[in-house]
Amino acid sequence: MKVGFVVNDIATETDVYTTTRIAMAAVNRGHEAWLIGAGDMAFDPDDHVRARARSVSKKNYKSTKTFLQELRGPKGRSERITVDDLDVLMLRSDPASEKGKRDWAQMSGIDFGRAAMRRGVIVVNDPDRLAQAMHKMYCQLFPEEVRPKTLITRDTSEIKAFAREQGGKIVIKPLQGSGGQG
């Protein structure tokens, strides 16, 4: 199988990311894995989604660090691929990490994923569902039994009162964003 992985940027992927592990496992099982950065995708005039993608030549890796080094280095393959030729496209980018830096990249994986679906590519992590889950309100759609007691507000006095009610131990998250940013 040919599997594409849309990531924020190949240069910022690390050897501990799940995407790197999945791509390496695919290669070790005899599949082709292509990493595609958000800025590497194009929608061509002939209605095909294409991408500047990177893959590896070797077929067996013991460490994700070596896999990633070879993918990025001179031993790695860089080709402009037609996304329609992939068997599966996995959307693995993190739109929240692009906010304020590369705002154009926030929705690009989702948009290109939608275009690939229209061309018959199996897209894992449904682009429409990902778009719905762009902020923490999405979690409120889950059953009450599987989510923590939640307050969503910008009012600091309400946050302080909620913290007191919870015994002073709460987790504060931005509505949209990650890592305390948003």
Regions found by a protein language model. Give the residues of each.
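Active-site nucleotide/adenylate-binding loops and adjacent lid/helix of ATP-dependent enzymes
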Residues: K2-G182
